């Protein structure tokens, strides 16, 4: 009897040792599995859970990203260009500093609103710059660019319907809220390149570096936009964004100098993103905006 009990105990111990390791593998159809274990002495009881991700859910997730970019770009253009239209139609009631403040504030608010959903690009140049640095998938670039241009065009159409601007005639000419160079094309291209470089340099610093204060990313980006509009607005309109220029141009049918507002912002943001990457002194992996670690979080953990 004692021998049988010893054999049974030894067998139980062997089974307990064999059950210590649990392997979880993902199935080929998109399902994922995890395990939960409870320990009693040397025995481990493992229970596996499997969660299947339906392709329809993955498709809906991608659609939500596109929708966030459309809505974000729409409200940004509607507020920013709307301030321009209201200022023109009311004889300067908003004032130029007020226009700068509107652009900066609306960008700040929208960054805080949808950055955790789509990244809050709202700008084809920013999307392309992120892709060149490996922070955004190239296969998603076309859908993002289309969404941003669509949002800008919809906002421009809304402003045209509400205020009657953007068309022909004296009133349409007066209320045009697109971007046109006040000086030469070379001057406009150079200035758009510099302010786009500056914008993307700031975005790369506050929104993608895991050592930055991530909670202040929206404030920093919005302030940068306001500063750029303040000193470059009278010369070029301070576009920094091909979608911001293409939307009003397509609605009004005015394409003079539009190539400047496509080529200069794209080249400027790409150079700005790479310039910051050269200054980055860390071997840690790059993180998405939603997962950005910050100085404030690290300080709270230390305390």
UniProtKB/Swiss-Prot annotation:
It is found in: Membrane. The keyword Lipid metabolism does not apply. The chain crosses the membrane at residues 66-86, 91-111, 145-165, 188-208, 212-232, 255-275. Residues 17-26 have a biased composition (Basic and acidic residues). Expressed in roots and leaves, and at lower levels in anthers. A motif (NPA 2) lies at residues 241-243. It is a multi-pass membrane protein. InterPro entries: Aquaporin-like, Aquaporin_transptr, MIP, MIP_CS. PROSITE patterns: MIP (PS00221). One of its GO terms (cellular component) is membrane. A motif (NPA 1) lies at residues 123-125. Aquaporins facilitate the transport of water and small neutral solutes across cell membranes. Aquaporins contain two tandem repeats each containing three membrane-spanning domains and a pore-forming loop with the signature motif Asn-Pro-Ala (NPA). This is Aquaporin NIP1-2. It comes from Oryza sativa subsp. japonica. The gene is NIP1-2.
């Amino acid at each position: 009897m004692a021998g049988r009990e010893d054999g049974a105990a030894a067998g139980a111990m062997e089974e307990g040792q064999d059950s210590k390791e649990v392997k979880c593998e993902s199935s080929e159809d998109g399902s994922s599995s995890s395990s939960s274990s409870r320990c009693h002495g040397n025995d481990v009881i493992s229970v596996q859970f499997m969660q299947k991700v339906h392709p329809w859910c993955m498709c809906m997730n991608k659609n939500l990203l596109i929708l966030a970019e459309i809505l974000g770009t729409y409200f940004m253009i509607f507020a920013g260009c709307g301030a321009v239209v209201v200022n023109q139609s009311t004889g300067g009631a908003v004032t130029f500093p007020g226009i700068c403040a509107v652009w900066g504030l609306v960008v700040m608010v929208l960054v805080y609103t949808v950055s955790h959903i789509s990244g809050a690009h709202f700008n084809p140049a920013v999307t392309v710059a992120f892709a060149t640095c490996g922070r955004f998938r190239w296969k998603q670039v076309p859908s993002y660019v289309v969404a941003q241009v669509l949002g800008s065009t919809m906002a421009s159409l809304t402003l045209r319907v509400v205020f009657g601007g953007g068309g022909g005639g004296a009133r349409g000419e007066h209320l045009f809220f697109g971007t046109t160079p006040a000086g030469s094309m070379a001057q406009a291209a150079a200035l758009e390149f510099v302010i786009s470089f500056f914008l993307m340099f700031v975005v790369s610093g506050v929104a993608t570096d895991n050592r930055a204060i991530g909670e202040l990313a929206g404030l920093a980006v919005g302030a940068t936009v306001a500063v750029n509009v303040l000193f470059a607005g009278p010369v070029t309109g301070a576009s920094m964004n091909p979608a911001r220029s293409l939307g009003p141009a397509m609605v009004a049918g005015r394409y003079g100098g539009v190539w400047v507002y496509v080529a200069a912002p794209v080249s400027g943001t790409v150079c700005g993103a790479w310039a910051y990457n050269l200054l980055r002194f860390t071997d840690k992996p790059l993180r998405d905006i939603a997962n950005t670690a910050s100085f404030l979080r690290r300080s709270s953990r230390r305390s």
